[in-house]
């Protein structure tokens, strides 16, 4: 039995995106490889007393490529959920439609699960409801407040929408959330707990309290408020903090034979997953990058690969003064001489840091790099920090022919690494 379980392969058959570059996979990808930026000045709420006044914000409207909430939920339903749930539903709906998976019989529905997480959840709803309660009293609190804010209800809403009655789960691991969701969902398929899993991350923390909290921790960029598109600059010596972003990335994962039998389109194969914790600090990574090193090593071991097998790394690369160099050095330490042939870029330079949605969004970017033979660039990398001498794909996307690619996500004490490859 153990041998048969270990041989279950996991592939990606559907993808969906809602990002600061637009709503939908195609529009987001095209803008990404054309080195466009989704980071702009915040105009949705008052930022006059905030030190950071910029964010990666989803374009909302009816024009092509914009996010229109009415496309995904009725107005009444929109009022019953926080935006992070709305974004998650939108990305999941895209992914499910893209996969073509529409189970009709109970057995197939029971073998289809959902695992979507968020780093923070309904922060805007919590903030708004706190104000209402303070100003108008407890009786004015909406009965939808709690279900609108709970992180697990992204998975719940998606399951209800499609009547998926398999494993229903959620992940809350800060910036590693989206990557953990994919890895954990893949393991459910590998272990035969499910045949299909809808997995990913979503986040909507661009609000006054979210901005104020990260600013108080001195985590955000503050030197580029007048030129927001220049603010996220991973590995550049002038970086001064990350740019918060919002959005969702969701994938449909499927057991290989199951996908093959129904003639599904296969984007990539999930080949490895590694986790670690550096047991160091709640917000700062260990100076020697030990957590990232172990997570990468574990992912390679899981995939039965060597560092020399890896062609491209989509890095965590948040644009923080401390984290970027630590991650870079951890990669070089593990890869040794193989680091000279690896390309590594950070797509946060285009969309900001999507927190709980970062890992899944960047996993999708990695898959699209495999599919299209194009590595997305690191924007604003004008003067690399001393020692940052890997190929960091500055400014322009690069045409490649790669087979094994890696998506990274890190959050201080938490580390998660995914390995993706072309389906053989």
Task: Walk through the language-model features, giving the residues of each.
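ACP-dependent fatty acid/polyketide chain-elongation machinery
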Residues: 1-77, 257-269, 364-378, 417
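Condensing-enzyme catalytic core mediating Claisen C-C bond formation in acyl metabolism
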Residues: 9-13, 40, 227-303, 311-312, ...
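Active-site-proximal alpha-helical scaffold in enzymes
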Residues: 88-101, 151-154, 159-203, 242-264, ...
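Active-site-adjacent elements of ketosynthase-type condensing enzymes
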Residues: 47-60, 125, 205-232, 274-294, ...
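Glycine-/small-residue-rich "gating" segment that lines the acyl/pantetheine channel
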Residues: 135-142, 180-183, 187, 196, ...
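Conserved small-residue
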Residues: 14, 32, 92, 114, ...
């Amino acid at each position: 039995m153990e041998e048969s379980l270990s041989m279950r392969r996991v592939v990606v058959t559907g993808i969906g995106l809602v990002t600061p570059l637009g709503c939908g996979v195609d529009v987001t990808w095209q803008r990404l490889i054309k080195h466009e930026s989704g980071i702009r000045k915040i105009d949705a709420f008052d930022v006059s007393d905030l030190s950071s006044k910029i964010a990666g914000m989803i374009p909302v409207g009816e024009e092509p490529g914009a996010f229109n909430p009415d496309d995904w939920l009725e107005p009444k339903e929109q009022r019953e959920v926080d935006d992070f749930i709305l974004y998650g539903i939108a990305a999941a709906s895209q992914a499910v439609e893209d996969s073509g998976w529409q189970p009709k019989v109970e057995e197939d529905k029971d073998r289809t699960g959902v695992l979507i997480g968020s780093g923070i959840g309904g922060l805007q709803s919590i903030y708004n409801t706190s104000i209402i309660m303070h100003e108008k009293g407890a009786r004015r609190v909406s009965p939808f407040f709690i279900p609108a804010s709970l992180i697990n209800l992204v998975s719940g809403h998606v399951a209800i929408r499609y009547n998926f009655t398999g494993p229903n789960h959620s992940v809350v691991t800060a910036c590693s959330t989206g990557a953990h969701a994919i890895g954990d969902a893949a393991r459910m398929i590998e272990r035969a707990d499910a045949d299909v899993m809808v997995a990913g991350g979503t986040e909507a923390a661009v609000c006054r309290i979210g901005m104020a909290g990260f600013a108080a921790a001195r985590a955000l960029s503050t030197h580029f408020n007048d030129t927001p598109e220049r603010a996220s600059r991973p590995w550049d010596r002038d970086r001064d903090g990350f740019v918060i972003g919002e959005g969702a990335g969701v994938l449909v994962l499927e057991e290989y034979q199951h996908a093959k039998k129904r003639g599904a389109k296969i984007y990539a194969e999930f080949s490895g997953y590694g986790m670690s914790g550096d047991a160091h600090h709640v917000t700062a990574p260990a100076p020697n990058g030990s957590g990232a090193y172990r997570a990468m090593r574990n992912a390679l071991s899981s995939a039965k690969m060597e560092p020399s097998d890896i062609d491209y790394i989509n890095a965590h690369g948040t644009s923080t003064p401390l984290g970027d160099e630590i991650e870079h050095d951890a990669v070089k330490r593990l890869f040794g001489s193989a680091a000279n042939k690896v390309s590594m870029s950070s797509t946060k330079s285009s969309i900001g840091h999507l927190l709980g949605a970062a890992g899944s969004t960047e996993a999708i970017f990695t898959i699209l790099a495999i599919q299209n033979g194009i590595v997305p660039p690191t924007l604003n990398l004008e003067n690399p920090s001393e020692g940052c001498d890997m190929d960091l794909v500055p400014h322009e996307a690069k045409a490649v022919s790669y087979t094994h690619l890696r998506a990274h996500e890190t959050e201080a004490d938490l580390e998660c690494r995914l390995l993706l490859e072309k389906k053989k």
